[in-house]
Amino acid sequence: MITSEVFPLDGVERVENATALSFTDSSLDAIIMTDVLHHIPDVELFFAEANRTLSPGGRLIMIEPWRTGWSSWVYRNLHHEPFDTDVRGWRLPLGGPLSSANGALPWIVFERDRTKFIAANPTLEIVTIEPLMPMSYLASGGVSMRSILPGFAYPAIRFLERYILHERGAMFALIEVRRI
């Protein structure tokens, strides 16, 4: 496993630009990302790089923000990053590596514009899109806040998520793409 980030950090092995990866052709078995795709300024270049660097059968696995009625309200009213489902293209406005974002971009690419993604990436197959985490992310405090519930409440939250709120209220999706 090789860890990378867009800027130097302690404990991270490499600094990488997702649109110009330094890995050789077909050298990666997987690219695993959490909350990254919606920050990449040109995802079409990134998909070309993923296609180039993944070995046949290699996987691109992402956990990304996802659009549901619930998440749209949360992202638009309680989150600091833009969440614009109506943009026409996939490119982000110019900005810093963390400041430029559209939380709706994964949904736009893999749901709204799925046909475009498939046509533009014939050797990348969408394997799974699994909406998840309608409540646990918020209850945990997300990335930068404290948990609002005690740890013993987690099993009840997970029960509600699995059996009642699963896809309708998801905040994120697990997206798996395979290089053919």
Region annotations inferred by a language model:
Residues L105-I129:
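Short alpha-helix
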Residues R59-P93:
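Conserved class I S-adenosyl-L-methionine
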Residues E44-R59:
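A short glycine-rich, Lys/Arg-flanked "PGG" loop and its adjoining helix->strand segment in the class I
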Residues M1-L21, A30, L45:
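Class I SAM-dependent methyltransferase SAM/SAH-binding core
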Residues A30-V36, M62:
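A short beta-strand submotif of the Rossmann-like class I SAM-dependent methyltransferase core
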Residues T123, I164-I180:
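Core SAM-dependent methyltransferase catalytic element
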Residues P41-L45, W70:
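Short N-terminal helix/helix-N-cap motif within the alpha/beta-hydrolase-1
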Residues L132-R158:
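C-terminal helical/coil "lid" or tail adjacent to the Rossmann-like core of SAM-dependent
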